[in-house]
Amino acid sequence: MKYLILALFLLSSALWTSSAQAAQAAISSADPDFSIVLFPDTQYYNNHNAYVFQDQANWVVSQKPALNIKAVIGLGDIIDGGGYPVDGSGNVIGSCQTAPASTWQTQWQQARAAINILNSHGVYYQPTIGNHDYDCEADRPQPRSATNYFHYLGNLASPPTAYIKDSSGNRTPNFYKIMTIGSSSYMILSLEFFPRPSVVSAANALISNFSGPVIVVTHAYLSNDGSGPTFASSMQPGTAYPLCSGHPGSIYSCLSDSLASYKPVGGGTDGIGLWYQLIGAHPNVFMALSGHIRLPQPGNYPNVPNYNGVGRVDCSVQSWTTLCSSRYRPIQILSDFQGQGNRGYFGYGYLRVLTISPSRKTVTAFTYSPSIAARPGNFPAGIPAFKKDSYNQFTFNFPHTFGGPDREVTQITSPLDGSHVSRTFPISAVALGPHAVGKMQIYVNGVKKGDYYQVGSLPAGTHVRLPGAGIHRVAVQTYDKTAQTWVKSVIYVTSP
């Protein structure tokens, strides 16, 4: 299905070039600091826990002046029960293979009541759709029908907000908000759960035709378990990586909670695919935000690591990964606290505040529960209102495309990370960044396979021979003569 873009600003017919995007995506250093608040996976804040959602909203209102809060972004799974399809008046007009929870209407009403607190105080709320927010959410293949989402939340998108519409002119749960903060214009772009290829195409057009920073939000993008054949042993707890596989023939094993398990109608695009096709393809993508993943499995706070349901792509730590050894390195954050606490306490009411400082060129995060602070007796003893560990309180520098520090990187441009390849296959890589480079080296499973001197890229026609069948770690590293250090890029490939 082809998608049409309803835009409230004039879209140029010509795409920006990468250099033009980079040049015009700047955030003015004279702009004031401001904050965006994330509400991750609020799905369990219903029935007797509905006060938690309201506590979050009331806290945001109380802190709006001090933190200069400009928006609240829901990361999806606003409710837990989906619901039967409804008409514009909320009357049930369809059935589901699997009946939704009997409280589904109450859940929507309670969520909207909490959101109304924000609206009544002039705080913008952007409701990204999650898998639990679709009609008949438990059916497989999962429907794309979102009548309840639009009935209860569809009037939140006040101008200048625009939806991506389908070829029949119907709006889809994919939309963007243009916000001017200081002298800079930002786009907050919310995309559906595992976006369909045509939605990704429409999003690419939007980003390409927008000259400012873009914050991409989608419910399922990052995972924090290093979901790949070898990553679990080499990635630190709390490190994020794109969820499952999104490009053809990828070798990465998916979590059970994946695109393959939901089989959404119309297909979809998950983590690796979103990185290659959208998030990593534009210099003006400033941040990518997601929820959905709650690993390890749920349990009470003292018994579950602090990184449950959280993670981030920190290129100062994991510079060798595909997400860091690329020309563009947007800030990427996973936030999902629903797995912390036994049933009745899931989530503990944690929200996340991102403070953007244009003058310092940093984004600082902290994680806080207004409910624990206000009602400690409602929660198990020892649960902190502020999460002060490094997984939940951290600072990013701006990406270099927005004036942050630039550095030398090595980028393997072919084959893609996770590809199936023949025993002997061509490889290409390039050095990117501000520094002079010396030689390049290729390694397979830790064994050096070649040296190339005084080059900024591997010579055309360079091939790698693998030692046998199976999964192999292929690395290309470049010597940064200015910093006097090696920088590398790593991919995993498999051969028959």
Predicted regions and their residues:
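Active-site environment of divalent metal-dependent phosphoester hydrolases
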Residues: 45-47, 80-82, 129-138, 172-173, ...
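Extended active-site neighborhood of metal-dependent phosphoesterases/phosphodiesterases
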Residues: 84-201, 209, 243, 253, ...
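Long, low-complexity serine/threonine/glycine- and acidic-rich segments characteristic of extracellular
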Residues: 405-496
